[in-house]
Amino acid sequence: MLISNEWLKEYVTIDDSVSDLAERITRTGIEVDDLIDYTKDIKNLVVGFVKSKEKHPDADKLNVCQVDIGEDEPVQIVCGAPNVDAGQYVIVAKVGGRLPGGIKIKRAKLRGERSEGMICSLQEIGISSNYIPKSFESGIYVFSESQVPGTDALQALYLDDQVMEFDLTPNRADALSMIGTAYEVAALYNTKMTKPETTSNELELSANDELTVTIENEDKVPYYSARVVHDVTIEPSPIWMQARLIKAGIRPINNVVDISNYVLLEYGQPLHMFDQDAIGSQQIVVRQANEGEKMTTLDDTERELLTSDIVITNGQTPIALAGVMGGDFSEVKEQTSNIVIEGAIFDPVSIRHTSRRLNLRSESSSRFEKGIATEFVDEAVDRACYLLQTYANGKVLKDRVSSGELGAFITPIDITADKINRTIGFDLSQNDIVTIFNQLGFDTEINDDVITVLVPSRRKDITIKEDLIEEVARIYGYDDIPSTLPVFDKVTSGQLTDRQYKTRMVKEVLEGAGLDQAITYSLVSKEDATAFSMQQRQTIDLLMPMSEAHASLRQSLLPHLIEVASYNVARKNKDVKLFEIGNVFFANGEGELPDQVEYLSGILTGDYVVNQWQGKKETVDFYLAKGVVDRVSEKLNLEFSYRRADIDGLHPGRTAEILLENKVVGFIGELHPTLAADNDLKRTYVFELNFDALMAVSVGYINYQPIPRFPGMSRDIALEVDQNIPAADLLSTIHAHGGNILKDTLVFDVYQGEHLEKGKKSIAIRLNYLDTEETLTDERVSKVQAEIEAALIEQGAVIR
């Protein structure tokens, strides 16, 4: 939002410089991103009057002008602008002057003719071509009103001004208007805010005699109103109004359109003006668009509408796309005489979806998306009527034609001075606090120690007590919050909690395994919200998301980790190994808080070990990813088991559930080839664990085991089994019959192919035996080995 200091002073009187004002506003929570000074780098710029114009004797495209610049004699200026003519008041840069871009004005000769100055266009004095009236796009600027030659041109243009650029957070939509900003500034300086004139001299003729309004979708359009103004004269708007629009980043068009945009900036209430005679009927019907319905918008583009779009119609044909853009045949033209002014409240979500789908973002749609102040809807329309009467010679019909309900102008919130003081450490009296609320334009009611604050609708960011406390702190001054030392009943030495200690251990293990920690957004698109979810539960969707990509709370960490991996690979960082510990969210019943669960996830793609001069290249595979997960289990003194599984988004043959005490706590697997290809990834492996579940079981420490004093033995066994039998089933059988001397097992070879029956595979397993109390004998080991082999044969294995 661009805030003109000259315009702001119309509502609130302050003596501070603009830089001091900007500093004060920033300190209270609205960041002033930039200060734009329209006088910067400009010197000796005056108003000139072109007394005569003659063709240059030696150049067809140049003119020799005699220009009165308020000095004793006119000066001669050679000008090449196609629209220069005698009798014009123009902008002149005098000799010795300076223009933006370091341009210095000197005496010169152009094709033999003396030139003592420069007649300027708006571009040449620093105005962006995007905001210049179309009539002056390719020539010099010509004043539409008489001026005094020699006076300061920037003053005559209302450009001797500084503009603050606000970087607003979404919750402060009230500051998207001059009046909203004026309320804020008045509160900071404890001064009064003056609102603009809105009262018109009305005709006896009623707007109700010429128009009816019907809303067919009040759930999407709670309120719609219209007023009628007759006999307007279409002409350029006053210079001061054009200047304010230019400084706000809007191109002036004509007085009627400019008044609509002016009130939008003034009140933050979007208006739309229809040519009453072009509407085609005496009724306005607001409804949802019909499927496949089409309309041509003001940009001469035919739009195909959806049933989610809101349209304004003449009873049959759409004449405007609500809150986004008007229709072409009802737009205000040079021949327009009678105006219908629309003021309405539209559903923010519907407007956002329509504007984004059609790529029609505008000043109006952005304000509707954030929600508008009900208190200003009718007032803004009345203000437009007053301005049309004053600057377009319009005749305002009495009465307002409306349908629906505006809704509450205020929201009452109860609070006490004690609550405020305890929260922010102030010692303010009840009167001090009431004064601050009154400074902000909030009415109050007092009942003993309870202050009922009547929050106006323009401040949609204030809904709870804590919001009121923040307002008191902002206006009183964050810098004035007293410094106090904390008081503790009991002082204890600091240390990590058990949870913090375990989390730190896991991070160290993963970092030691070569993974880097990532931190990603908790918000994902609605499509990704349930991707890889271990609990198929309802998602938590935001009511007013900033974008479709951040519309829901995640149920898995993997969607964003996949995005991060894809982002890195696209930038030639092809070996990606990442992990994240973060929260996921699951909805409960209506009115209940959601479940918030901490997860641990990882993603690996590319080479795990780079092929350098002293190392062998090792590409990421399933077993390497499983080894990373096993390191986590070992560090937490847990024992995972794995079970084959089918999980959406993962390779059907290379995916397993991770079990802890026979309960599923996670999964591991290769990203499905289609999903990997969609993200420009090669073979990629992921894992996800319910970290809360691990923490609930983990002891967090490993008992010390002395180094064995007696030697162990190893036996290898090769088994031929059906290819569908998982190795994990065989290992379970081995451990079940291995007694207390079988310490661990290792699958070191799997073979399928020649010399084996179709549908069979060979698995080689190493069994490690150890007795910590005595030396093992061959007979003892052979006996256990025989029991194991018998159990395996019973399971269907063939000993090779």
Curated annotation (Swiss-Prot):
SUPFAM superfamilies: Anticodon-binding domain of PheRS, Class II aaRS and biotin synthetases, Nucleic acid-binding proteins, PheT/TilS domain, Putative DNA-binding domain. It comes from the Bacteria. Its EC number is 6.1.1.20. Binds 2 magnesium ions per tetramer. PROSITE patterns: B5, FDX_ACB, TRBD. GO terms for biological process: phenylalanyl-tRNA aminoacylation. Residues 708-800 form the FDX-ACB domain. GO terms for molecular function: ATP binding; catalytic activity, acting on a protein; magnesium ion binding; phenylalanine-tRNA ligase activity; transferase activity; tRNA binding. It is found in: Cytoplasm. Residues 408-483 form the B5 domain. Keywords: Aminoacyl-tRNA synthetase, ATP-binding, Cytoplasm, Ligase, Magnesium, Metal-binding, Nucleotide-binding, Protein biosynthesis, RNA-binding, tRNA-binding. InterPro entries: aa-tRNA-synth_II/BPL/LPL, B3/B4_tRNA-bd, DNA-bd_dom_put_sf, Fdx_antiC-bd, Fdx_antiC-bd_sf, NA-bd_OB-fold, Phe-tRNA-ligase_IIc_bsu, Phe-tRNA-ligase_IIc_bsu_bact. Residues 39-154 form the tRNA-binding domain. It catalyses: tRNA(Phe) + L-phenylalanine + ATP = L-phenylalanyl-tRNA(Phe) + AMP + diphosphate + H(+). The keyword Ligase applies. It is an enzyme of class 6 (ligase). PANTHER family: PHENYLALANINE--TRNA LIGASE BETA SUBUNIT, PHENYLALANYL-TRNA SYNTHETASE BETA CHAIN AND LEUCINE-RICH REPEAT-CONTAINING PROTEIN 47. HAMAP family: Phe_tRNA_synth_beta1 (MF_00283). Belongs to the phenylalanyl-tRNA synthetase beta subunit family. Type 1 subfamily. Tetramer of two alpha and two beta subunits. This is Phenylalanine--tRNA ligase beta subunit. It comes from Staphylococcus aureus.
